[in-house]
Amino acid sequence: MSHADQLARTHLAPDPADLSRLVAGTHHDPHGILGAHEYGDHTVIRAFRPHATEVAALVGGDRFAMQHIESGLFAVALPFTNLIDYRLQITYPDSEPYVVADAYRFLPTLGEVDLHLFGEGRHERLWEVLGAHPRSFTTADGVVTGVSFAVWAPNAKGISLIGEFNGWTGTEAPMRVLGSSGVWELFWPDFPIGGLYKFKVHGADGVVTERADPMAFATEVPPHTASRVTLSSYTWGDADWMTQRAARNPVFEPMSTYEVHLGSWRPGLSYRQLARELTDYVVEHGFTHVELLPVAEHPFAGSWGYQVTSYYAPTSRFGTPDEFRALVDALHQAGIGVIVDWVPAHFPKDAWALGRFDGTPLYEHSDPKRGEQLDWGTYVFDFGRREVRNFLVANALYWLQEFHIDGLRVDAVASMLYLDYSRPEGGWTPNIYGGRENLEAVQFLQEMNATAHKSAPGIVTIAEESTSWPGVTRPTNLGGLGFSMKWNMGWMHDTLDYISRDPIYRSYHHHEMTFSMLYAFSENYVLPLSHDEVVHGKGTLWGRMPGNNHVKAAGLRSLLAYQWAHPGKQLLFMGQEFGQRAEWSEERGLDWWQLDEQGFSNGILRLVRDINDIYRSHPALWSQDTVPDGYSWIDANDSANNVLSFLRYGKDGSVMACVFNFAGAEHSGYRLGLPSAGRWREVLNTDATVYNGSGIGNMGGVDATEDPWHGRPASAVLVLPPTSALWLEPK
């Protein structure tokens, strides 16, 4: 019998077309060729090990040498059927033989229900089925440990697993596609936790690329781009916080947020070190929350995290995912909430990441007029595709559930809502009704918000939305987008425009400080003095203030007091709490040295600590942020004196009078209408000497008499220091 006849009779060699696709890396079902297969009265085991010199099958106590067929395919015919278990003994050049379970004898690690839910865009725990998952199986010959890999790439011609385990060659670990789901899967025995990997994708366009796992839970430290297998062993200590969170509604709670870029707050700190130092700092200065610029992995540090390539992996720059958990845990145990910036609007075009993942527009929209963001040179997600929407919604839940994140600040919402956002005429495609609204993005945001609030009660979602889109914070069941809050960009622009003017010109722009109250209760607002205001040549808050250093410091103190008194939650970017004078750069740390001087920075920082303490302890400043009952003008029209005054009311009946003198001169004998006679205590005076102010004030309080003024039944005569804020409460 010829050799060819023997191969044909024993089925050692597969169909030539199958073998050709296997060798080329484009076979959709390598498990149909490799592994153990019965043919009549015998069983054929095939293994594809192109770099091996020898392969044998170990069955019970017997060793069966496998024959090299061609191109790295080894096979052996066993003279029996009903094979229960076996191992492969593999020898590579210049190495000892090693024994391993055969990857191609295991059933799929994804079930039909998982695939169905994903296909429908409804798998809320997608991270539990896609990506890399350490697993163990009990077999007749013992326990087999390894890692299962699953990736969605419906148009790929073939996908292979590559990594350190196979020298990054894309041949010996081909994956199988599961039915019509587009999901490719493989369980690889003995793959180590901590091991690096990528997917070698044969794209529909004929291009072969090496891709990071879209669902990677850990990565190499940039600029390296491989994904890393990880398994959490973290034990949380924030049970009390999580229980309390579920019972709260952040809209009706104090929220004073410190916005942080982890890499430049104090450069060189790890997640573990930040857990100590950042937590201590935030607690000491009275903030209730931190908001972290995006922590999902991103290759380009200069993007500040806003060009994400691994949506499910905390950046490895500062440590492991469990060490990031430790940072969140430490903040929670100290009573600090954690918000992260989340970027579902767009993603970068890096050839190893999400873009054209399977050789077609997969995560991005196929229409370039919808699928590319020209300003940023990025791709835009296809929000109408069920699997893409599932990828993003599940990602939001992943951060909330796996990392106990308390809120998501969604970046660039306006770019998602409008099809013509920053596009020239003729450069965009209208919706089915001929309009400019991105209906698919609206549906995605509604789904994300509704699902997030259902799955994680007490969390907050915040929109960075710069237009007048109606109902951003209206519940989804009432037709809104369903966010908890949105950034008040109008307040920010008007306030900074006003405060940057010389006081002698401010009276002509008084309306800039009153206009925000015309819409203050139309949405649930956050008042942001964010990172966007201290970059790209904008300088700093300190630098915007007119005058000499004394006047600048007074201006910044009054601005911060105005922000905290205005209806809405507060957000302040790092460095502005002590009046950093240099524009922020991600390439260097904050100018902490300013606090070592006997200058104005210490006073500004002391003020922030005090206003946070006052704010948290006075419900008048936060419990009715979103309703007109929480606010009343005393005098909105004193433009001649550059004075604004209003009352804040708490649900508990408390009241706070807030007076702001934005003139460069003192106003003595200033009569202010008040709701009741009696002693009014000066809770805050931003010109106090403890803040390095001039010390002008009212000796700690004033006596209001029953003399009507400003439409109020009582009034008091005040001294208003130049460029200052006073907060008063009835004693």
Curated annotation (Swiss-Prot):
This is 1,4-alpha-glucan branching enzyme GlgB. NCBIfam families: branching_enzym, PRK05402.1, PRK12313.1. Disulfide bonds: none annotated. GO terms for molecular function: 1,4-alpha-glucan branching enzyme activity; cation binding; hydrolase activity, hydrolyzing O-glycosyl compounds. Its EC number is 2.4.1.18. It is an enzyme of class 2 (transferase). The active site is at D411 (nucleophile), E464 (proton donor). SMART domains: Aamy. Pathway: Glycan biosynthesis; glycogen biosynthesis. Keywords: Carbohydrate metabolism, Glycogen biosynthesis, Glycogen metabolism, Glycosyltransferase, Transferase. GO terms for biological process: glycogen biosynthetic process. Catalyzes the formation of the alpha-1,6-glucosidic linkages in glycogen by scission of a 1,4-alpha-linked oligosaccharide from growing alpha-1,4-glucan chains and the subsequent attachment of the oligosaccharide to the alpha-1,6 position.
